[in-house]
């Protein structure tokens, strides 16, 4: 058995105008230019895949790439860039997936951006004032949009009953609203959990 892992792909921020030279032409890439962003992503993917190949991991396997930003602005540049990243990952035999926050900008267009999979976060577990209805609403949205779900656990769930009960609501919601079957699950474990 090999544990499958995904590498994050970060958004080349347009305000980064001196990224560095990634293609050996002696000119630093400018992230405010689409063509330079395309070069940066190509360089990053090639570097990641080369490292992965040379490492010859025995027990882990690169399964794909993860778009790190949890929301997408509606600009034409974002649309072009994310589609280009999805195309570049597909050309290399990998998928690109996304985990947006609850009802984030871009959620309803996730497939148009080229993501193979998108798993929405209900964002219920971390804030005690977030209503339980987020769980059902998230389940309804992911069904309607053909998405998947992220199940989250707070580090406080191990020491504070209120956070533990919130985590259990995710699990119960999966039974009540059907996302425990026939749906991909992503899991977010707060970095403070299990320390």
Predicted regions, residues:
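Aromatic-lined carbohydrate-binding surfaces of glycoside hydrolases
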Residues: 1-50, 63, 68-73
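A structural motif corresponding to the C-terminal end of an alpha-helix
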Residues: 1-3, 48-61, 85-94, 141-147, ...
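Glutamate identity and glutamate-enriched acidic tracts
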Residues: 29, 35, 50, 61, ...
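Substrate-binding cleft of secreted/luminal carbohydrate-active enzymes
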Residues: 103-105, 117-195
């Amino acid at each position: 058995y090999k544990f499958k892992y995904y590498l994050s792909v970060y958004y080349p921020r347009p305000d980064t105008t001196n990224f560095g030279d990634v293609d050996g032409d002696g000119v630093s890439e400018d992230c405010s230019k689409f063509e330079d962003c395309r070069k940066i992503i190509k360089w990053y993917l090639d570097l990641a895949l080369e490292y992965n190949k040379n490492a010859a991991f025995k027990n882990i396997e690169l399964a794909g790439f993860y778009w790190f930003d949890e929301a997408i602005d509606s600009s034409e540049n974002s649309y072009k860039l994310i589609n280009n990243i999805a195309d570049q990952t597909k050309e290399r035999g990998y998928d690109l997936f996304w985990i947006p926050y609850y009802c984030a900008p871009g959620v309803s267009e996730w497939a148009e951006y080229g993501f193979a999979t998108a798993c929405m976060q209900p964002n219920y577990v971390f804030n005690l004032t977030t209503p339980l209805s987020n769980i059902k609403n998230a389940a309804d949205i992911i069904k309607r949009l053909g998405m998947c779900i992220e199940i989250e656990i707070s580090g406080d769930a191990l020491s504070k009953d209120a956070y533990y009960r919130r985590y259990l609501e995710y699990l119960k919601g999966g039974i009540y609203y059907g996302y425990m079957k026939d749906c991909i699950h992503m899991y977010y474990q707060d970095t403070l959990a299990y320390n």
